[in-house]
Amino acid sequence: MNYMHLGRAGTGKTTQLIERVIDQLTEQPLGPSIYFIVPDQMSFEMERRIATDPRLSGLVRMEVMSLRRFAFHMIRDYGNQVIPFLDETGTQLLLRQVVEEAEEELKIFKRTKNMPGFYKGLDELIASFKRSLVNPDMLRQISGASPERSPKLNDLALIYERFTERISDKALHADDYFTTLIELLPKADLSDVSVFVDGFYEFSLQEQQVLLRLMELTKDMHLSFTLDVEDVYTKQSEFGVSQRCYMQLIEQMKERQIAHEDIYYGQTVKFQSTGLRMLEQALLSPGYPPTDEEVTGVTVSAAVNRQVETEAAVRKAIQLVRHDGYRFKDIAFLVRHLEPYADHLERAFQLYDIPYFLDQRESMVHHPIVELVHAVLEIVMTGYREESVFRLLKTELIPLPAEDPRLALDRLETFVLERGIKGSMWKKPWQLKRRLADEISLTDAELQEELELNEWRQFLVEAIEPLEKRFKASKTMSEYTRALYRFLEEHHMTDRLTVWKQQALEVNELSQAREHDQVYEAVLLLFEQLEAAAPEATLTTELFVQMVETGLESLRFSLVPPSLDQVIATDYVRGRLQQVKVVFLLGANDGLIPLVEDQSKLLSEGDHDFLHDQGIPVGKASLDVFDDELYYLYQGVTAPSESLHISYALVDEDGKALQPASIVKQIKHQLLQDRPVKTYFAEAGDHAPDDQLQFVTSPERAAAAAAIELRRLQRRYPIQPSWFDVYNRLLENGRGRERMALFSNALFYQNQAEPLPEDLARNLYGDTIKASVSRFETYNACSYKHFARYGLRLKERKLYKFEAPDIGNLFHGALNDLSMNIKASGKRWRELDDQSCSNLAKEAVEKVTPEIQNAILMSSNRFGYIKKKLTDVVEQTAKMLVKQAERSEFEPDLFEISFGNAMFPPLRFTLPDGTEIEFTGRIDRVDQATIGDQLYVRIVDYKSSAKELDFAEIYYGLAIQMLLYLKTVVEQSEVLFNQQAKPAGALYFHVKNPMMRGDLSADEIERNQLLLESYQMQGVIVENDEVLRAMDQIAYDERKKSPLVKVTFTKTGLHKSHTKGVVKEEELTALMDHAWDELKTSSQSMYAGDIAIDPFDYQERTPCTFCEYRSVCQFDQSLGNDYRQLNPLSEKEVLERLKEETE
């Protein structure tokens, strides 16, 4: 006999079915089989519930299983042969192959086949066809009824048909199990078998056929449906999906003359609170009258965001367990869609130390062995790209042959990134090379490094080359799969994962150990699915790789069944909760409840409606979607027996405002008299006084909350006196005291770098400093940056990139080489013509190019183009230098001269503690001019970007290099020129190829004048009439504005407002002496251990803007850091201050 158990939620249907099972088991412990069929996620708890009943001593004749598991069980026992099972992954792999082969015949899906999720959507759609008993011919027959949908339906019919043909007898699709089961059931003797079916919201047409066949063959069968007994046979019922399913079954039972008996459950027995009883009646009845009674068991609250919402619910759960006698297993957290809340739930459970079961299967995609397979396939397909190579090596499943494999990997990666090694370069020996200008041989240590790098290179190539060769020889799916499997076995993946598993067990990381156990088995199962899908199919390497990657992305870790005392977190459509007393329903926001989502990635809402109109019930008609969502919600809110706590967030993770779901408004109106809801905030002090101590759930959380409140007090905000009691209690508890100190230190932390002890500073910097001026400028810009760079010696990893410093190096190298060639030829700059400049420039660039960033400008056509543009810049610059030389008495004489060696000694001084300071450097160019009997010198610094000499920056020690270089040349002039020289100035020259704008009608002379002016040098010049004349004879004689330097001559002298940087000789000396004093001052501070985080702020410019150490110093104005404000100073103000300081 067949029994239909019908009733609303909470009327005792499940309990009655269990009781009937227990009665049969107690009467006949060893009788005929009993199958209790439930949804998969309900099977473990149902079996535990029956097995732990004290009336039973065992479950010999009863099995609890899902319908799919029941099908597998029957096919295994009564099928004639073992057919490979094609799971979701195998199905998607086979579908990809079918689509690729049929690509030219497809109209719509030809364009969309490479979109993310396409094959998953196609798999779901074909599964839906099978569950709805739809075949390809049915799709073709209805395609004519809708011309606009005809191409899509024909594409689907073609793919579905080819897929069915391909799978045929070779493998069994997941949704073919039920078809096979129906054929096999008569072979099993089920005449004395009892079947109980419970917990399902709906059955597909395919599943209904299984149930009908069981009704015909078994002794008795019991099915439960959640319905209102008063309108069981009403076509339009509030119970949507369940009602439709029941009616479909009844109609088919009548057609097949299957007798049944309806058993009605009208009395609600589950709910222990007035609120839940009323909610069960009101939810599906919007017209349910509001109550004036004070209801219990139902609450609604809001929270500022999802994290706060989740933590508030978790704190409430802790209170229930600690103070109200509940156990964790009595509590569940429900959402409609788990993804927005999964991370928040997991974090909160771990934070508050709550045992939990999160009903979400994690992807395997980030496990090292999956990464390894991805990486090695990328290498085979695209060559030895650095991303693929190091993606493979960083899995540590194929460690480098070195004493410390991780250090070896870091060194190898550093070398590869710096040299831009890729592709075939991995298969050729590597050489460590110096700059071409450096003829020093490699040291023994460098030779050893070269040897080790080549050993690691060869190891990697030898590991991958066999797979490359096997792939080239492979043609079929089976050959490719076995080649990949052989690669994994050759590198002992099983052994390595076994070691990792054991290491995880030793530190009690059980979940990690389980992952290592599952993942290799899952990868091998994927290979089996590939072979099962199309073992002898011919395919390209590219297609095979795509299929493997599709499969890898679908791998998921299996869920561990919940323990005896854990809270459960799941979505209320998937979850099947039993004997739960309290439910926290999170995310009651519009858009999540009801959930607005596409049923299929491939069919639109209109497509679904069309199919339903044509009698093909694939998916759901749009009119049914909302009703079914409401029914799912009904199942969720009726899951608890004692209380339901609904909450929603006010904003999402992006700060976007969220609205409460319509259910919130309905419940507030019908049950809660529209009272305002309580809102939860992130900090305790934002709550009402009585609610603040809810944050005191453990010493850790209490300490965190108390520390925040104490910080409020520090900022002069009032706090509740109870927090002083919490603070004192924490100090009495060892664990609490430790946590309080930790949180207090964090909250009151000031990001300040304490001075180094002087002996430590000396150990870091040495007894003698031999350094460039730029090092001291760095110290004056920010002493902590200096400490990071020169004390800790932190460096960014060098990359094979062409950046601004490389451009500067090329300009400096080319101009130096060009200048030296001119000097060696015996010619003067002014004697060169344009063609000579072009030739010399090209030769210079060609010479220095191999020295720049590992010859990057020779690596590709793109960089070849960049090299040509840079050559143009050098050519144009050389021509302008000739034009400048024609107007000036200053002759370029020395180029790229380095001081700080035996030929050109450095300037040095001794600190009071005996520390020797020597400063070194390289001067781009020194010009000289003899005026009368006196030699004058000026220095010129080439810049690849515009630069002016700011007197205020000189005063603050930020731009002292040029002045110190000039001082050095003057003081060493006897060595350099065999006579004492006087300073004429220090100038910046901008190397560029300017885009000239102006009057197109201007003649060539005007255009040349404008071009020359664009190269005007900026800096400081001594105010001496003869020197100024030597700077630009033509402008001086014509009493005009000079295009060479920032000077304008008038009949009476200089035009002050159009002249910049011109100072008296004593003022220039004062500037040089001040730069020298700044050098001494910064040296003393450096050795005193001053490493303060004190970047300057000068005219909205700070050294932090492009600082590579920002992540080290953690500069943050909210943590006590601030900029050292430097006030702008004019040239006059600086010179006056220097004068005052020397008097």
UniProtKB/Swiss-Prot annotation:
Residue intervals of the UvrD-like helicase ATP-binding domain: 1-274
Keywords (A to Z) from UniProt: 4Fe-4S, ATP-binding, DNA damage, DNA repair, DNA-binding, Exonuclease, Helicase, Hydrolase, Iron, Iron-sulfur, Metal-binding, Nuclease, Nucleotide-binding
Residues given in the record as ATP binding sites: G7, R8, A9, G10, T11, G12, K13, T14
Residue stretches making up the UvrD-like helicase C-terminal domain: 267-565
EC number(s) recorded for this UniProt protein: 3.1.-.-
One biological process term in Gene Ontology: double-strand break repair via homologous recombination
PROSITE patterns linked: UVRD_HELICASE_ATP_BIND, UVRD_HELICASE_CTER
Essential cofactor(s): Mg(2+); [4Fe-4S] cluster
Co-factor binding details: Binds 1 [4Fe-4S] cluster.
Single GO MF descriptor: 5'-3' exonuclease activity
Misc. remarks from the entry: Despite having conserved helicase domains, this subunit does not have helicase activity.
Alphabetized HAMAP family for the sequence: AddB_type1 (MF_01452)
Known role: The heterodimer acts as both an ATP-dependent DNA helicase and an ATP-dependent, dual-direction single-stranded exonuclease. Recognizes the chi site generating a DNA molecule suitable for the initiation of homologous recombination. The AddB subunit has 5' -> 3' nuclease activity but not helicase activity.
Name assigned to this protein: ATP-dependent helicase/deoxyribonuclease subunit B
Species in which this protein is naturally found: Exiguobacterium sibiricum (strain DSM 17290 / CCUG 55495 / CIP 109462 / JCM 13490 / 255-15)
Upper classification of the organism: Bacteria, Bacillati, Bacillota, Bacilli, Bacillales
